[in-house]
Amino acid sequence: AGGGHVVRALPSYCASFLDYVCLGDVEELGEVVRDAFGPQYAAEEHHPRFDLAHYIGRVGHVESSRYCNFSCSFCTLTGEGRPYLPVSADELRRQLQAVGRKTYIGINDNNFFGNNRKSFKERVAVMREGVESGLFRGWTALVTNDFFLKRENLELVRDAGCTGLFSGVESFDTAWTSRHNKHQNAVRPQVEVIRECLEAGVTFLYGMMVDLATRTIADIRAELDFIVGCPEIPLPSYISIPIPIPGTPFFYECLDSGRILPGTRFRDLDATTISVATLDPLAEAAEFARDLQSMRGYRARIARHSVRFAAANRRHLSPVKLGLALYNAALLCEPLLTTLPKNTGQAAGRRTHVSGTEPLDGFYRPKFRVDSRFEKAFQPTVLIDARGCLNEEIADDIAAGRDALLPRRGAVAAV
């Protein structure tokens, strides 16, 4: 059985590999178990058994909502078009009790804030209960930028024990964020939002996207120079390259304009590999993408920024919150893949950071001998072939995804 966005975007293609193509949420696995093993093996209600996950440490995780009420063009949630769905206060409380006593709780939502004010306040109240009862010391969540339009929202979560908030800044260039339908980021200046959050005593975390397809290397370097030269704001938690994920408006825009590089495979869509034609020469862009993985050329300035940021914010943030913000410096100066599981196997060769030329990693080498009929399962799925054309094996799924997206996103051009 398989699920997730790739399966939802390519259901017909994936059916050739999977016994069960799951297009819904994780609870659909109950139906798989009922069909494959019998109804006696499937629970009537979905209650995760955190007690069986002995490896969970001091940080627990819960889910207080699903999906998002915004439609950023590069986001898989936009491609799937599901409405924002918060859970009830009772359900969130039940999850917290199941997780048990932890030091911190991470709320694994796409958007903790959402568009339901009543639900938001109820869920914050539940998190306050957990802190006050000693179930955990603090918590973190992801919110969209509209959360910061009213200071009372920030004060509400801070007083409820919120340690840190992650928000998708993506770029300080509001023209770029607006181009990707992320208009909520243009309502207030981002530096002002970040400063207000920090001064309220809540760590602000964010990520950056460097779009080499629409911005020059010089332009992106100027933005990075601004960040490392501004001690008022923390460093980003990550810096990634935009991905043309099938099913999203951004994907169809790139597909229709012929900008996805020939030979691009699904395994290349990893946020560290260039898969869309760049403004600068591709060789220069690839070298820049490689240097970004360890922030080559910025490490000394990152160290200075960390010292200055700590000095500027130690009166606002506790040692734990300050440490959370400063941890980003270590994340940026280490290759992105070092944060992934270590047992996935190493790539068989030097990385190129260009789609279609990246060496394959251990996922494509079976650990033991398998029958030849499974050979295709260990080959990367081609998105765009060597001629620059869409892979015919997935063409029907891609067309169906466009048809489903058009009613929701009229800006997506028809085939």
PLM regions with names:
Residues 6-13, 70, 115-117, 175, ...:
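Flexible glycine/acidic-rich beta-alpha junction loops that bind and position SAM and/or redox cofactors
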Residues 10-16, 152-153, 214-229:
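Catalytic cores of alpha/beta
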Residues 1-46, 247:
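Glycine-rich beta-alpha loop elements in corrinoid/cobalamin-binding modules
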Residues 249-251, 267-415:
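Radical SAM enzyme core and accessory elements
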Residues 20, 104, 164, 234-236:
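Residues at the N-termini of beta-strands
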Residues 48-204, 210-212, 225:
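Radical SAM [4Fe-4S] cluster-binding motif and immediate context
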Residues 15, 30-37, 93-103, 227-230:
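Alpha-helix C-terminal capping segments
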